[in-house]
Every structure is written in C-alpha cells, then in structure tokens.
Amino acid sequence: MTDIEIAKNTKLDEINKIAEKLEIKEEDIEQYGKYKAKISNEIYEKNKSKNNGKLILVTAISPTPLGEGKTTVSIAIADGLRKIGKKSILTLREPSLGPVFGIKGGATGGGKVQIAPMEDINLHFTGDIHAITSANNLLSAMIDNHIYFGNELGFEKVVWKRCLDLNDRQLRKVETGLSGESKIVPRIDNFDITVASEIMAVLCLAENLKDLKQKLGNIIIGYNKKEEPIYVKQLKAEGAMTVLLKDAIKPNLVQTLEHTPALVHGGPFANIAHGCNSVIATKTALKLADYTITEAGFGADLGAEKFLDIKCRKTGLKPDAVVIVATIKAIKYHGGVEKEKIQEENIEGIEKGIDNLYKHIDNIKNKFGLNVIVALNKYASDTEKEIEYIKEKLANKNIELSVVEGWAKGGDGAIDIANKLVKLSQQPNEFKYIYNDSDSIKEKILKIAKNIYYAKDVKYSEEAEKQIENIEKMGYGKLPICIAKTQYSFSDDPKNLECKDDYNINVRGVELKNGAGFVVVLAGKIMTMPGLPKVPAAESIDIDEDGEIVGIF
C-alpha cells in the first residue's frame, strides 16, 4: 500500500484521548475537528516546576535526491520508546506547501510510521503558515502605505520582502507600484517562501505571546538616508501582526499511526533558515514526557548546527543524545555510485561514500561534544554484507549503529534503537558551541566553515564585506550566525560531494534578522524562494468525486 493508503486504513484516536496521555486537560486544548488540536501556551507554565525529560535530536548525513527518511526514523523512535514502556513525544516542524507540490512531497513520515491526519498536516493544517504569510504581507502593505502618505520615517531603502508559501521562481525579483498613480513610487521587490520569512523564525524562537510581540517590533524593515535602521515598532505594526499570529503561536497536537503524541509546530527550512520547530513546542514537550524526539532539517551540517548554535544557545536547551540517520543508498550516492545502480550491492561505493557519515559523526561527537548513535534506515535492497560492513566500520570508531525498520514494521522496527537511546541519553556529555558570542561575524563564519564544513577559507563579495561592516557598526555583531547554503554538500556547491579540505565557502550576502536575533549568511547560489522542478509533485496530486485525495507522498 502507498503511504496515503496506509494512513487512511489506520483508525486514529480522537485528539482528546491523545491529550490525556500527556495529562493535558480538555480546557487546555482547542480542537480542529476530531484529530487535530491547538494546545494552550499556559500548559508550559502549569508544568514549569517539573523536571525536563530527555531531549533526543535526530539529524542526518548530507541528503540526497533519494531521501533518507529522517522524519520516518524520528517517528519510529518515538513509537519504539512507547513500545518499551517509555513516555515519549515527538516535536516536528510543519510541512510547507512548497516541497509538498514541488520535489520532496509530503513531510509526515512514511509506511507504518507517519503522523496523522497526513493530508491535513501536509496541506493547510491549522493555518499557521497562512497566518505567518498574512502577517508578513500586512507589514509589506504598511511599509508601502507609509511611503505613499509622506514617508515620515524617511525610508531610503526597504529590505523587508513579501512572501508566499509556494515555490515560484518568477517572484524572486519583481517590480511593484506600476499602476501609474502619481504618489505610488515603483520599486524593485522580492518574495521569499514563507518558511524563510523572519516572522517564521521569530514565531519559532519566541517564548510566549509577549516575547513574540517584542521580537516582531525589533525586526529591521529598512534604512533611512543616514543608513540608520528602521524598525517594525516605529511603524507601529507589531500589534496587528501579533493579533494575526495569536493562534499560530500555539503548538499543534496530532498523533502517530500508533497513537504516540506529536507536537507539530513551526516550519523554517534548514538550508535557508534555522531549521528547527518552535521553542514553545520543544520546551512544553520536555515537561510532558520522559523522552522528547525532535529533528533538525537536512544534514547535521545545517539543521543540527543551527539547532545547537542558535536554538540551544538562545534557550539553554541541551540534547541528551543525537541520532544521525543514514541509508546505504545515500552512502553509496556520496561514494559516486550512479542512481540507476544504487540498489546493487556495492561495498566499494560504501567505502568511498562513508566519509560523509564520518564527518557528520565527528562534528556532533567531537566538535559539539554530544553522544551519538547512527540509525541505518533500512531499505529492501540493502544486503546483510553491506550492513555488516558499515557496522564494523563504525565499531572501529566506537560508534554504535542500529538498523531501523520503522517503515515496514512501525514501532516494532525501532525497539533496538529505543533501548540503546535510553542508555545513551543517561551518559554525561560535554556539550559546547562552535563559536563564542564575543567572536566577530567573520570569526563565527570561519569557525563554522572550517570545523563543520571542512573548508579551507571563506571568501566574501564586496557587498557582503560592506554588509558585515554595517551590521557590526550598528552593534549587532555578537548575534549567532545562520548560514544559508545548499543541503546536498558540505560546501556551497551542490555538485561537490567529495568536499576535500581544499575549497572555500563563498559568501555573496549577509542579512541582519534582528527580530529573530541572528545574522543570515548567504553562501553560494542558494535562493530564499525555491523553484518547482521540471516535473513537480503537483502533477500527481488529485482528488476524486468522493473527496478522496491521491498523490501526496
């Protein structure tokens, strides 16, 4: 059966029963139908005195077009922990419509390990991303309206972009204000995908409604003739924006196919944003369960680095264990094996490609000082010889491997890794950051480039040099760094899979995200508004006369 058929043939518990598993009272949930709910932000305050449960971060090797199944493994682990009698909860990001209709498809797991209702989650869900889009574009409208009625704040340059939760390359650069009306000034504008909007980052890093409003007010939207920043609070827009986000800030409660609770909230990409679910969801989950399973987007060089260097730095969170998801297909792909031959047994290909996995392990274990286990997401084409070869190679580096068969067996396919994680999460670790707050922007970028990306050096465009100088002059040089680059390689070139230490990271631009509290560094040719592939997933998605959706995977 397909993923969507498996999901449709599974009887879900009503959402109030899932809430009961977490000891959440009925008055603290707002139901969106039978199987979805918002939970009150007061739940964290009510449980604040409780000790935190264990935090397990799931990341992966560098992703490939084949898909590694990070979300699938995350769900399997949560279900597996429940199978061995542990109280577990998932905290995941919400899918964006861009990938759903683009190249990646849905983001709710697969096979017997999915979060549900999968069609709802993959599409509009509870409207959080639409609310962010509305708040973002309300701000854009208010900026242009302010300029239209006299420009009292003296906008000389507008840096705030409009957004849309779809992949649409035509909107990367547009000209607005072409109506010909005398008071409307035409200008070049840009669109980001909504999940790259600073408002998404702000929502995911806010501790509560008050903090959300304050962070929104601190967003820089433009500069005057003196090159001084203009903030949202000067436009008096943060109140209306917060009103639009008053429900979006509340975490969404759903379930796995095996009825494990899941908080699915926030959805920044890890290649062009910070790639983590909301702070509110993670902190709440830690009070409600013994084990919180969360994931960070793409490979450990992107999502995990940002989870650790940005989210943990800002919140004081610290993972008790880290899972690095790998597949034999992906290892062979990084070893240069062609996609057409990827399912054939190939020890030589594994030998060449396993270095990618080694680097991610080294980053998490030695650079960040955290305990690591590798989850091998098993496919039918994997051979015992290949599995044993990888297991032996990792054993030589004192790294444990667990074969996960969640897709085929559900939580039963993750009992081994669940037991191992219980033990691993009890061991002490020596968590540390890659850079210090006191480092300059360039020092932070260089430390990430050398330690995490294995680069030789960092090269800057003239524009990037000037932008860094201006950011530090304004007093924001101590903020964390969020590098936006390709997910397919340690480098900024998606085709450079070998990534020997003789290449440079090329920085073309730097953007201050003062509301979110970090500096975005644009490396290589990464775009904050993706485009659709030649054959988008949208072509296969349909609905029949009975309202049954097909084609979401």
Protein language model features and the residues they cover:
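Flexible phosphate-sensing "switch/lid" loops adjacent to ATP/NTP-binding sites
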Residues: 1-553
